[in-house]
Amino acid sequence: MMLRLTSVSCFLLVIACLNLFQVVLTRRCFPPGTFCSRYLPCCSGRCCSGWCTRRCSPRYGKRATFQE
């Protein structure tokens, strides 16, 4: 009986530790110059085009090109 109780306690302790590690790892943030997304936030600055930067630079698209 004691062996069964110990193994169940050990199993529950492992599950609790894994849940704790998951919370710690999912709440981390990334420094400038690394990849970011909606679910992987930047520590400081903003996520611009998938990269952590201090400020977003203006985007130049087809409307910003010079046409003759």
Swiss-Prot record:
Covalent S-S links between cysteines: C29-C43, C36-C48, C42-C52, C47-C56
Protein family membership: Belongs to the conotoxin I2 superfamily.
Signal peptide: 1-26
Localisation: Secreted
Prosegment location in residue numbers: 64-68
Tissue: Expressed by the venom duct.
Keywords: Amidation, Cleavage on pair of basic residues, Disulfide bond, Secreted, Signal, Toxin
Official protein name in the record: Conotoxin Mi11.1
InterPro entries listed in its UniProt record: Conotoxin-I_CS, Conotoxin_I2
One Pfam family matching this protein: Conotoxin_I2
Transmembrane segments: none
Domain comment quoted from the record: The cysteine framework is XI (C-C-CC-CC-C-C).
PROSITE patterns named among the record's database cross-references: I_CONOTOXIN (PS60019)
Coiled coil: none
GO cellular component: extracellular region
GO molecular function: toxin activity
Residues modified to Tyrosine amide: Y60
